[in-house]
């Protein structure tokens, strides 16, 4: 497995953001975003893991970096839950590794774009039991959130920021909104923000993420 890209802050780290890229991208995809955020988050380390390369069914079996196989796109995503679980376990291991460096779990954040965001949702609100600084979900969905979703007390205390394009034709806006509503209805402090964009990231969105992180890091 490719080692994560680790961006150290200007000052000794006392917080961390673990940021997962989307389908077909790599660990360098969000490096410019992380570097921009570190200009104001002077004590925040960024960890950018790399998805394994695997065949992706919806792309004709072509091999590409992917956190899990996507078998069908509509009417709802059909995915490999087994591979999703493996990826979520990887994120859990990264959280534990950051804790061993001395960073408190309450100052560790999970962020993910598109497919990476789905892994982040699953890790934080299905698998992880304990405090976390928060979740940042960009242009994503939650394939394992259903009507039966039950959150523990610690999971309910994990704040979340959901950001989505109004014109996203890859992960429809309604799919992201559904994840937001699932969390909101279960008592999570969750914020929904829309932008006039497609399946992408805008400078204003990055600014808003920086402000959200700064407010929680003090």
Swiss-Prot record:
The keyword Hydrolase applies. Keywords: Hydrolase, Serine esterase. Its EC number is 3.1.1.1. InterPro entries: AB_hydrolase_fold, LYPA1-2/EST-like, PLipase/COase/thioEstase. Coiled coil: none annotated. Homodimer. This is Carboxylesterase 2. It comes from Pseudomonas fluorescens. The gene is estB.
